[in-house]
Amino acid sequence: MEDDGRLAPRQIWARPTSTTTRSYVPGCTPFLLPSDGYVYLNRTYSISLGENAIYDPACTSTPTTTEHAGAALDIHDPFYASVTPLLYAMGCATVVSYLLVIILLITPRTFYVGGPGGGANFLGRHGMVSGSYSNNSSVVGVGGRPWLQKVAALLVAISLTIATADSFRVAEKQYDHGYSDAEALTSEVIDGTEIKVVRIISSTFLWLAQVQTLIRLFPRHKEKVMIKWAGFALIVLDTIFAILDKFLVKTNTTRPRLYEDAIPALSYLFELALNLLYAAWVIFYSLSKHRFAFFHPKMRNICLVALLSLCAVLIPVVFFVLDIAKPEIAGWGTYIRWVGSAAASVVVWEWVERIEALERDERKDGILGREVFDGDEMIEVTPSEEVDWPRQQFHGHDRGGGTGMSSAWGGVMGLAHRPLRPRGGRITQTQREAEGATAAKSRKRRSARPTPPPAAVTPVSRADTTSAASTVYNVHYYPVSSPTPPVAMPFMEEEDEGSDGDGEKELAVVQNQQSSLPTQDTYTEPRRQNSPQIVNVDNRWRFILNPFKNRHAALPREVASAQAEEEGFLSPDDQAPRQGDEENPHYTPRHRGLFSFHPMSDGASRRQSGADQPLPVTVIPARRRGQDTWSPQWFTNSNLVDRSSSRRTASRPRDQRMKVIQPQVQSAAPWTAADMEASFSSMDYELRYDPEAAALVSEDIPDHHSQPTQADSPAHPTMSGGNGPSGGETQSALDTGPGIEGSVNEGSVIEGPEESHSQR
């Protein structure tokens, strides 16, 4: 009976007494635990098996729930998707974020010190006061960070600090439970409420800082405005969709490829577009500034800054692509993109500062400033401050970059938009009289030549122009021993080359119309408005334009003969003006009526003569507007000649040294038949203007060249006049000369000896 209670060993499995079979659910089948082993229930309690044991799981209809479904060590994911690379990446990102904060807040300014030998020294602290260096200093300030970058970098550092703390907390929890899961760690940390809020705020300031950096890269004001508003619109859209994605849809952040809704896809799209546009424009700027952006002898470490800048702008774009291609690295790639966006603004700003410092150093000795475009309202703003968002100006030490240089360049750029102001203005009639009375005492030099009128587009009629009324032409004679006078440059004033005060000449304005004419007041104002403006320029220009100024050339014999008669023409008693001459409207003081092309040659001739003697002056008045010009038809058409002879009046001035030709009051021919016979009967030659002699010379008198230079030689043929009417013969002689058309116009003053007409 005792054997009935015992079971054979085979009956444990087979149970031969039972005629039914039992089926087990997969995973619920009992299994044997061999002897000589241990069964661990927890870390402190274990059971030793002295013999075999059977484990029969309690299978139910519902599966057993566990807190963590992963195994103790998940070996299915690669190493770069494990917890260890994730923690290292977060630690590095946090350290970089704090370095950016240190760069922005603790060391706000750096300086570029370029020596005369081309050397460079950066990161040298030379004081915190901007603009404390002179313009000649080679120290160029680089720095001055905008407050948007400071706020963005500080928020990124705070966000990464919170994320790092949460990551270590979750990793420790997984270690306590004996497993490690990187995906679970990332989901628990990034999907936290505090990280979501801080990340949205910091991302908004990061985009604003990047837009501010882009605004600085482009010089045109229109481009700055366009970038500002386009970037602001993209930032608003990205922020709105990010808020909807984080708090409304609550999608899987670590698996961007598994997006099934439109809101997270749009948020991802706007974020990717902002990073792509920023990277593209920074690369374009670096290529446009390739002379300074990648390497420069004065700043050899700029290549390192360029490398860091390019990496900072490309890291967000690269990790956006990797998030789609390899979702396993999306866990720690998010932190890299986060800190990369902060570095893309801070490092690129430093790069731009150094590029502009090199540009300022290169053009500091030039005369050109920075480019100014149409609509640019930031001409005199420093580069570091011109793109700042609205804020109050402080006089702190970290505002603006290179303010010492910008103050100097602001004045240079302002000169480019202001016309040159002449140093000598227009002279009124009262000023002329006052200067004429005191010119002998003051001895002030003025411009040697007036400003030439601008070139006309179409041919101008000589009868309609009013410029001849204010034009003065001077003809001087020089002895054979004097050098050829140099050609004076317009807008230039010759310096006093000698101590002899008699050699100083002044610009003369001759009033060549009588006060009795009714049209005198009509043309006074236009002539005054058309008067030339005088600008004093350095004397060294004369040598550049005329390097052969010391060349000596012999003058024609006619000029030498006229100069010989000029030296002994007047006596010292005639130098004082008579009382009646001052009342004459045609009276002009001698010191105002003379004009010198070269004071040295004129002073030499006067020292040879031993006396300061004035020259006689012939005044050719200007023709009225609308008056007919001289025509060869008057020689053949007697009607024109007879009609003009009845209207012309002649009078002689009181001063015998001056010949005044009366203007034509009506529109009539200036000559009569008798005048032409008297004028041209004894004149069988023509006059031409010789630029070397600066005088009117004859071409038809060959015997003058063979006669020696004497005091009684014939005078220069420029001084015409005779027994006919006082001014008619002179004007006819001047008008008949083929070379006088371009050299002697109406209103001309011709100086020369008076005996010339008596000898002819």
Curated annotation (Swiss-Prot):
It comes from the Eukaryota. Residues 575-585 have a biased composition (Basic and acidic residues). The chain crosses the membrane at residues 86-106, 151-171, 195-215, 229-249, 263-283, 302-322, 329-349. It is found in: Cell membrane. Disulfide bonds: none annotated. Residues 107-150, 216-228, 284-301, 350-760 are cytoplasmic. The keyword Cell membrane applies. GO terms for biological process: cellular response to pH. It is a multi-pass membrane protein. Residues 629-642 have a biased composition (Polar residues). InterPro entries: PalH (IPR014844). The keyword Ribonucleoprotein does not apply. One of its GO terms (cellular component) is plasma membrane. Coiled coil: none annotated. Residues 1-85, 172-194, 250-262, 323-328 are extracellular. Its main location: membrane. Residues 389-465, 479-503, 559-615, 629-666, 696-760 are annotated as: Disordered. Keywords: Cell membrane, Membrane, Transmembrane, Transmembrane helix. Residues 492-501 have a biased composition (Acidic residues). Required for the proteolytic cleavage of the transcription factor pacC in response to alkaline ambient pH. Might be a pH sensor. Belongs to the palH/RIM21 family. This is pH-response regulator protein palH/RIM21. It comes from Emericella nidulans (strain FGSC A4 / ATCC 38163 / CBS 112.46 / NRRL 194 / M139). The lineage of its organism: Eukaryota, Fungi, Dikarya, Ascomycota, Pezizomycotina.
